[in-house]
Amino acid sequence: MTNIRKTHPLMKIINDAFIDLPTPSNISSWWNFGSLLGLCLIVQILTGLFLAMHYTPDTTTAFSSVTHICRDVNYGWIIRYLHANGASMFFICLYAHMGAGLYYGSHAFRETWNIGVILLFTIMATAFVGYVLPWGQMSFWGATVITNLLSAIPYIGTTLVEWIWGGFSVDKATLTRFFAFHFILPFIILALAIVHLIFLHETGSNNPTGIPSDMDKIPFHPYYTIKDILGALLLILTLLALTLFAPDLLGDPDNYTPANPLSTPAHIKPEWYFLFAYAILRSIPNKLGGVLALLLSILILAFIPMLHTSKQRSMMFRPFSQSLFWVLVADLLTLTWIGGQPVEHPYMIVGQLASILYFLLILVLMPVASLIENKLMKW
């Protein structure tokens, strides 16, 4: 008798995706981040659901409803901080996942990569609207500043901003719709993640060498299920340590002050995971130019498959490209630091140089290094 997991219509899908899936035998821990992102998404949806049961999306009660969750709801404080720090863990895993994809040439799977870029935009949108919900000072002013960027669009900009706001400023209508968006978007992310997996399983996984591994595959279960469980335990441990020992480490103290449209915080800045893009936005003195640079800083990822000039897929055997990759990582860390600093002399010029280097690395230096490496292979 054939095993039920191979014959049952639903079990067969699960079996082909997580049990009998042929997987390269040499994939490293950098391949753990996909499953960790799935875990993060589940944690966020569950904690978010319980928070939504007690939260009220109204300007007069939003801030106090979050306080109520932390003080009066059973284990409300841990649910709230798991959700807030879960977002940080989500982005850590996301950036590691993207970095590994870039390093090992996973962008050769065009469809999977492009769905990934769409997923990134959706996750960033979800995190942004979610940050507005506690209705603290940084929530309010962050929403005002970031939505206002759309007014830089010629002709329709102002109308578009007022349409998103649902009025002439960030107010009750804005908060209500942002809550609606924040509730629906994770389910869209879930659907997109399934599509992402479908496309990945069409081609099979890449591996660190970038060389086809069809002749050397092993079943996903038990080898990689065990490996994923180890990663999951480390993720949960880190998340719990952050939540229980330093819940406000990555947050902004200004968000513990209720939103006040009449008082602007000294330094308006987004959460840490958006600071690199915020630094690029601020480094251009022109509003429209800044908005375009901000958009391109993320959208540039969609062009990476076209910018791949190397004859090798992975960077494993390409020392020049490796060096430039780590320069890019250092550059992004520099931009993240600059994004959190005030707009004054030393920081502004460093931010501008780091922004130029970011685009220069991706558009010019890395493709040129790949061409040089191609020449060196003939020696």
Curated annotation (Swiss-Prot):
Domain of life the protein comes from: Eukaryota
Pfam families associated with the record: Cytochrom_B_C, Cytochrome_B
Localisation per UniProt entry: Mitochondrion inner membrane
InterPro entries to which the protein is assigned, alphabetical: Cyt_b/b6_C, Cyt_b/b6_C_sf, Cyt_b/b6_N, Cytb/b6-like_sf, Cytochrome_b, Cytochrome_b_C_euk/bac, Cytochrome_b_N_euk/bac, Di-haem_cyt_TM
SUPFAM superfamilies, sorted: a domain/subunit of cytochrome bc1 complex (Ubiquinol-cytochrome c reductase), Transmembrane di-heme cytochromes
Mode of membrane association: Multi-pass membrane protein
Binding site for heme b b566: H97, H196
Keywords: Electron transport, Heme, Iron, Membrane, Metal-binding, Mitochondrion, Mitochondrion inner membrane, Respiratory chain, Transmembrane, Transmembrane helix, Transport, Ubiquinone
Keyword Iron-sulfur tagged: no
Cofactor: heme b
Function in brief: Component of the ubiquinol-cytochrome c reductase complex (complex III or cytochrome b-c1 complex) that is part of the mitochondrial respiratory chain. The b-c1 complex mediates electron transfer from ubiquinol to cytochrome c. Contributes to the generation of a proton gradient across the mitochondrial membrane that is then used for ATP synthesis.
Subunit relationships: The cytochrome bc1 complex contains 11 subunits: 3 respiratory subunits (MT-CYB, CYC1 and UQCRFS1), 2 core proteins (UQCRC1 and UQCRC2) and 6 low-molecular weight proteins (UQCRH/QCR6, UQCRB/QCR7, UQCRQ/QCR8, UQCR10/QCR9, UQCR11/QCR10 and a cleavage product of UQCRFS1). This cytochrome bc1 complex then forms a dimer.
Name of the protein in its database record: Cytochrome b
Gene: MT-CYB
